[in-house]
Regions:
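Binuclear metal-dependent hydrolase catalytic cores centered on His/Asp/Glu-rich metal-binding motifs
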Residues: 106, 119-123
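Metal-dependent phosphoester-hydrolase catalytic domains
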Residues: 120, 131-144, 150-380
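Conserved SAM-binding loop and adjacent beta-strand
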Residues: 24-26, 122, 344
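N-terminal signal-anchor transmembrane helix
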Residues: 1-11, 16, 21, 26-30, ...
Length: 380
């Protein structure tokens, strides 16, 4: 084993909840975040929900001395809300959009845990994220994933992501922890947190993570993990509705770990079980999306028929000797607009759910192929 000195690498992640004019005390909280980052001087800072470019420019101007390098990921009409600050040069950056929903900045939120309609969406996104990590991380010495993943530690999507990629959870692996009980990052006592999110979890929820893995002869371990704990001393409000997470990673060159890091090539029976479970959930999602697509299609046809009847009623007086249509004109126009709106909206929904079905089916096929490949290796 190489005796090269270990390199300390500090990663900070925070969902800033920075919806300008809607989120409470945005500017005051950004000033608190700037002060924290300037004092702690993390190597890499990963911020989410910085929705306004003005807020990003404010952060960049204040962090010039401690974090001179940064990138703001622009996407769509409202942006991605993602930005990265670093003490070292950022040589390259890339924004990947999930194929379903098109969000580049998050896995789909869990709006109702009991009736989670978006579970198949999050599984698809976790699968795509896992594939992205596998394909882009092959030439990297160290891979780090940080942010709000909108998944509990034991959720299927989280298990799929970690088992498929070999990423390690810094909270579970750390040698020393300091912060909220259980590493929770969404606390009921946080004055900015939504009551609905934490009502079923009075002790809090852990949905913000720093995941990591080494490769190409580098071993990585988490020496220290820290979370903020509500309102900091001397302040009258927390940094955000989420708690920040800071991981101190120790990276050391070690040629003996090459075979251990090739997680992709391991024939893991647990991964087969997780993929089968994920496929079952995707099939449920496909069935639900097909039902909604069918209903949308019927509604679009109904709207089109009503619109066609309107056209016929308008043409009849022009081509016959029948007296002018006695149907009230105002009601006639209103009915026409309603029919057009129903046909248009239902048609858009039909197209959207058709895309949803195809994306879910494609992911289910990919998982099926992965299971077959794993089972073949297990059989040999």
């Amino acid at each position: 084993m190489s005796e090269a000195a270990a390199v300390k690498f500090r990663v900070f992640t925070l969902n800033c909840w920075g919806i300008r004019y809607l989120s409470k005390c945005c500017r005051e909280r950004y000033e608190m975040i700037v002060q924290l980052l300037s004092q702690e001087r993390h190597d890499v800072v990963l911020l989410q929900e910085v929705w306004s470019e003005k807020d990003y420019h404010f952060l960049r101007s204040k962090l010039t001395n401690t974090h001179p390098y940064s990138v703001y990921f622009r996407s769509g009409a409202i942006g991605s809300g993602l930005c990265v600050f670093a003490r070292y040069i950022i040589t390259d950056s890339f924004l990947y959009r999930y194929s379903l929903n098109g969000y580049p900045y998050k896995l789909h939120a869990e709006y109702c845990r009991e009736k989670d309609y978006y579970l198949p969406h999050r599984l698809l996104q976790a699968w795509e994220l896992g594939q992205f990590i596998r394909h882009t991380g092959k030439t990297a010495d160290v891979v780090v994933l940080g942010g709000d993943l909108n998944m509990h530690p034991c959720d299927l999507g989280n298990r799929l992501l970690q088992c498929y990629t070999g990423m390690k959870d810094s909270f579970l692996e750390t040698e020393q922890f300091e912060g909220c009980e259980g590493g929770c990052t969404l606390l009921s006592q946080n004055c900015f947190a939504s009551v609905g999110d934490t009502q079923s979890f009075p002790s809090g929820i852990r949905i913000d993570y720093v995941l990591y893995k080494g490769s190409r002869g580098f071993s990585v371990k988490c020496e220290h993990l820290m979370t903020t704990n509500g309102t900091p001393p001397g302040r009258n409000m927390p940094y955000s509705d989420h708690e920040a997470v800071c991981a101190t990673l120790s990276v050391q060159k070690d040629e003996n770990v090459v075979s251990e890091q090739r997680h992709v090539e391991k024939t893991d029976p647990q991964l087969v079980d997780i993929l089968n479970e994920a496929r079952a959930e995707l099939k449920i999602g496909i069935h639900g999306a097909e039902k909604v697509r069918y209903s949308s299609g019927r509604m679009a046809i109904l709207g089109f028929i009503l619109l066609l009847l309107e056209v016929v009623m308008a043409i009849i007086p022009l081509v016959t000797t029948t007296p002018e249509n006695s149907f009230p004109k105002v009601s006639f126009y209103i009915l026409g607009m309603v029919a057009f709106a129903v046909a248009l909206l239902a048609g858009i929904l039909y197209v959207f759910h058709t895309i949803e079905v195809k994306m879910l089916q494609g992911t289910e096929d990919q998982m099926s192929n992965a299971i077959q490949a794993l089972q073949e290796r297990l059989g040999h």
